[in-house]
Design a protein with these regions (language model features):
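Rossmann-fold NAD(P)-binding glycine/threonine-rich loop
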Residues: 49-56, 60-61, 68-90, 97-100, ...
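Generic structural signal for hydrophobic
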Residues: 5, 35, 54-58
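Hydrophobic beta-strand scaffold residues
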Residues: 12, 28, 65-66, 89
Length: 237
């Protein structure tokens, strides 16, 4: 994000990293409590464990926030919604525009093929901590919503094991971790006679950095509230 921000004309005032990894020509602090600089907003790719400190900093300084971290609990989501009553927050599980379109296509296919069996497989590098990925959960949500509109009840099944028959409406979600794979998400719809697969593969994290910078430019001009990729894509950024 730092390199792409500089290349796109966005000045990075400082960074926050408890381990202070990497080399930058701006200050890097181990805590938000140490930050002295003023900025137009914050871009966050970190961990759910940093949420409380992050929200406290942004709210107390009236700073817009791009929240691109995944793995939040329901309690975390409630905290984010409460903070969004005070500041503008852009929250998404994936900042890539192509992933956004991937999810939209999934919803359309799920609606048209509501009687097909659906399975989701996500693959990431061996250092990714949360499973399933936020994007895989977004894929399930897209399928579930599209099918509920047709009166079909869906249920997520995380990693199949044991002896059990697949139930109608089940959506399997499977996670693979290995090597340095940036990220791949595949959704397949099966019938007795055919199948259709929709896949998104990320080859570089530049994809997500550019999307986060677009989200930053978008959110700093907004009033308080909770925003998503739907809002950003409507602006044709």
């Amino acid at each position: 994000v730092y390199e792409r921000a500089k290349e796109s004309g966005v000045n990075v005032a400082c960074g926050v990293d408890k381990l202070k990894r990497g080399f930058f020509d701006c200050p890097v602090y181990s805590s938000f409590d140490e930050v002295k600089e003023y900025a137009d907003g914050v871009i966050d790719f970190s961990s759910p464990t940093a949420l409380d400190e992050l929200l406290r900093f942004c709210v107390s300084n009236s700073m817009p926030l791009v929240l691109a971290t995944t793995g939040f609990s329901e309690e975390d989501d409630e905290k984010i919604s409460e903070a969004a009553k005070l500041i503008p927050i852009f929250k998404c599980s994936n900042t890539s525009k192509s992933v956004y379109l991937f999810l939209k296509i999934l919803g359309e296919v799920a609606e048209k093929l509501s009687d097909y069996d659906a399975e989701i497989i996500e693959r990431h590098h061996n250092l990714k901590k949360d499973a399933p990925s936020g994007t895989a959960l977004s894929a399930y949500n897209a399928i579930e919503k599209a099918r509920s509109d047709k009166g079909v009840i869906s249920e997520a099944v995380f990693g199949r094991k044991g002896l059990s028959k697949r139930k109608k409406g089940d959506v399997g979600i499977h996670s693979v971790r290995g090597g340095s794979l940036v990220g791949e998400h595949e959704a397949t719809f099966y019938s007795q006679y055919d199948s259709i697969s929709i896949t998104h593969t990320a080859y570089s994290k530049v994809l997500f950095a550019d999307g986060a910078i677009d989200a930053f430019r978008f959110i700093i001009a907004k009033e308080k509230g909770l925003y998503s990729m739907d809002d950003l894509m409507r602006t044709n950024v």
